[in-house]
């Protein structure tokens, strides 16, 4: 198959607010700014891949028209976290006059929660000093990591994870344009691995389409290095039945044969346990505690193989109590 060499998340990125998927409440409020040509500082908060950057770019396009790329700048705060990025790049852009008919410019600061406290304090002063010539749109995963003086100067927009329906509809639209077919099971797989993240969903589709123009659930789980939900269910069941040896073989098959990372398996086990309607409440609490301990130990540098086997042992012990 001749798959487009262009990265699909850019190829199919919405060009205007009307094309934004799954964030209707946010879009309606942003449209009011376009209508009045007035814009406060904004704070976009939410998980990755839910449309924060897309909305910022689409807003600038509609606000400025043909001159949008001259009056809009995007910076990623995770690249340079210190105060120098505020004093140099941000301040330099904010202090210059807008071009064309625009009355202000927009600076979009992605991952603003990566800025240090000192950098955020400097940013707050810059936002105040250059409010006439520049509006700031800050994007973050966690608004709690943004200092209160900045939050109080922004209109805050909370982006929700996209629904399975919204992701499936967009995936179907892209698949039709690219001339690929998708099994029903593949839609379920894409929504499972993406967790409301459209960027992850589209990347999974493109990765699978490179392998075959007929996308299956098997392709999706393989290309994203995820275990099938049933494999996680079976692994947990063997542990709770006390069959440590079988569970260990299943775990090693997922980690070594399929190359699934231990932290990804922890995430999938957490999803299975937290969503279960059959597990006893006390047992569920114990299992999540075991997952948290394994996650912490691995984050501190403990051997992942040993910790994953130890996790199975703890789950087996909890199931026997």
Swiss-Prot record:
InterPro entries: AAA+_ATPase, ATPase_AAA_core, DNA_pol3_clamp-load_cplx_C, DNA_Rep/Repair_Clamp_Loader, P-loop_NTPase, Rep_factor-C_ssu_arc, Rep_factorC_C, RFC_lid. Belongs to the activator 1 small subunits family. RfcS subfamily. PANTHER family: REPLICATION FACTOR C / DNA POLYMERASE III GAMMA-TAU SUBUNIT (PTHR11669), REPLICATION FACTOR C SUBUNIT 4 (PTHR11669:SF20). GO terms for cellular component: DNA replication factor C complex. Part of the RFC clamp loader complex which loads the PCNA sliding clamp onto DNA. Pfam families: AAA (PF00004), Rep_fac_C (PF08542). CDD domains: AAA (cd00009), HLD_clamp_RFC (cd18140). Keywords: ATP-binding, DNA replication, Nucleotide-binding. GO terms for molecular function: ATP binding; ATP hydrolysis activity; DNA binding; DNA clamp loader activity. SUPFAM superfamilies: P-loop containing nucleoside triphosphate hydrolases, post-AAA+ oligomerization domain-like. Heteromultimer composed of small subunits (RfcS) and large subunits (RfcL). The gene is rfcS. GO terms for biological process: DNA repair; DNA-templated DNA replication. HAMAP family: RfcS (MF_01509). It comes from Methanocorpusculum labreanum (strain ATCC 43576 / DSM 4855 / Z). ATP binds at residues 46-53. The keyword Hydrolase does not apply. It comes from the Archaea. This is Replication factor C small subunit.
